[in-house]
Design a protein with these regions (language model features):
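Conserved Class I S-adenosyl-L-methionine-dependent methyltransferase catalytic core
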Residues: 124-163, 170-171, 177-285
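Ferredoxin-type iron-sulfur electron-transfer modules in oxidoreductases and energy-metabolism complexes
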Residues: 24-49, 71, 75-90
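Glycine-centered, phosphate/nucleic-acid-interacting loop/turn motifs that mediate DNA/RNA or nucleotide
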Residues: 62, 190, 383
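Alpha-helical subdomain
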Residues: 124-184, 194, 281, 290-454
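Phosphate-coordination loops involved in phosphoryl transfer and adenosine-cofactor binding
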Residues: 5, 284, 382
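Fe-S ferredoxin-like electron-transfer domains
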Residues: 71-124
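Local cysteine-cluster metal-coordination motifs and their immediate loop/turn environment
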Residues: 5-25, 48-68
Length: 454
């Protein structure tokens, strides 16, 4: 492998309010412009662009340091990027007007800046100001809401290859003034770039949030937008101990089901290879996928197994979506679909493997025990059940995502929650399973695997 010819380090550190920093001066837009221009000029194999912490000279940011020469640029804007790429990376000639030439003065300014920042932090602490990380966590909903609204209104598609706020508003069917405020906020978050009053998608937003991209994640992200409404009832849910009725009418099923299954499919498509490798297909001729959603796991197992047949059990409206994925994979002969209710239905019999993925968190303890007992009845002697879910530590205060997801179940279900390894092991033993094993996988969820006793 050939080393990069140039390494570019761009400061993108966020600092407490009132303290100068490159991120407040548009460093994220500069980073996006650099990456896009390097790619456009075909220099991706020669130039590596990396975001880093504070370089100093914060009042003159955004700052870039370029190696191997150690060239330092200050006050860089997105408009400067084409010249930097063309002259410096393409021609080997640094852009003189952006250079910091006096190294001694720069070092002195960096030292003074450091003292100034430390003094400001001490003053904030003495005044009882919230630590910046805590303040950002409390206000984090603002950034999330701005992005979700942009996706709900299809703003990134409206911006396309470039659009003014009035043009985008016309395409979105929204108010021009409010649209510009929204697009400005999204640009500040780094998902749009704004040049001369015209908004442009960044490589990130064009890839995931604009129509026509092969990695279009809009439908999956709409599931998060739907969850927003549920999470707004969290305070009431904690008082009541369960999900509470929302004040607004529930969206039609197709507006809920499609985004939900799209989100689950996107996640399952990434995780399925890990699950198949961890579980294996040896000795598996028939598999039942309980609440199998888009059939992503059944497809992965059928593709990995030698003649393995999988059956997906789910609601009719979900199976209509699963059918599209099964047919697209060319596996209609190996993956079959069965309409049913996993909460009450007999699951059948004669299966070598039963997969219960992302189901148990929707149910209460008694419901999970009942489901696992029916899974046992569906298995041949010695057959395995595989439960994939968020698995909490014994004290239930970690991992972080599993603990937060438990709240997601509080606001969205009657009895659901995230559960610990000990709870799963207890249910499996009570349901008639043995050889219970916790298999840890990359990512937030793990597997509980057990074998039918007798």
């Amino acid at each position: 492998m050939q080393p990069y010819r140039y390494h570019v380090f761009a400061c993108d550190q966020q600092k407490p309010e009132g303290i100068p920093c490159c991120s407040a001066r548009g460093s994220r837009q500069v980073l996006d412009a650099l990456r896009a221009e390097v790619a456009a000029q075909g220099l991706g194999d020669q130039v590596q662009v990396t975001a880093c912490g504070s370089l100093g000279l914060c009042e003159r940011g955004p700052n870039l340091v370029i190696y191997p020469e150690g060239v330092w640029y200050s006050g860089v804007t997105p408009a400067d990027v084409p010249e930097i790429v063309r002259s410096h990376f393409g021609g080997g000639v640094p852009v003189a007007r952006l250079l910091n030439r006096d190294a001694a003065a720069a070092r002195a300014e960096i030292a003074a800046n450091k003292q100034k920042m430390q003094g400001a932090l001490r003053a904030r602490e003495a005044a009882g100001a919230l630590p910046d990380e805590l303040a950002q966590a409390i206000r984090g909903f603002q950034e999330s809401r701005a992005i979700l609204t942009a996706i709900e209104l299809d703003a990134f598609t409206a911006v396309g290859g470039g659009a003014s706020a009035p043009a985008a508003a016309q395409a979105m069917g929204t108010d021009s003034r409010a649209t510009e405020m929204l697009l400005n906020a999204v640009a500040a978050l780094g998902l749009l770039a704004k040049r001369d009053g015209v908004f442009h998608n960044t490589p990130l937003s064009a890839r995931y949030f604009a129509a026509g991209s092969p990695d279009d994640a809009r439908a999956a992200t709409m599931h998060t937008a739907n969850l927003w409404r549920r999470w707004s009832t969290l305070t009431e849910c904690v008082r009541a101990g369960t999900a509470v009725a929302r004040r607004e009418p529930r969206a039609p099923d197709d507006q809920w089901t499609e985004p939900f299954i799209a989100a689950m499919h996107r996640n399952a498509r990434e995780r399925a290879p890990h699950v198949v490798r961890a579980v294996g297909t040896a000795g598996v001729g028939r598999m039942l996928d309980v609440g199998g959603g888009s059939a992503a796991y059944s497809i992965a197992f059928a593709q990995a197994g030698d003649g393995l047949c999988a059956e997906v059990l789910d609601r009719p409206e979900v199976l209509a979506i699963a059918r599209r994925h099964v047919e697209a994979a060319g596996l209609a002969g190996l993956v079959t679909l069965r309409a049913g209710d996993l909460r009450v239905d007999d699951l059948g019999s004669g299966f070598d493997l039963v997969l219960v993925s992302a189901i148990c968190h929707m149910l209460g303890p008694e419901e999970n025990l009942d489901l696992l007992r029916r899974c046992r009845q569906a298995l041949v002697p010695g057959g395995r059940v595989v439960v994939q879910d968020f698995i909490l530590e014994a004290d239930k205060a970690a991992p972080r995502m599993a603990a937060l997801f438990s709240l997601n179940m509080l606001v969205g279900t009657e009895h659901g929650a995230s559960y610990s390894e000990n709870e799963y092991a207890g249910w499996l033993a009570a349901a008639g399973f043995q050889d219970v094993t916790h298999v840890r996988l990359p990512g937030p969820s793990g597997l509980m695997v057990a074998r039918r006793a007798g």
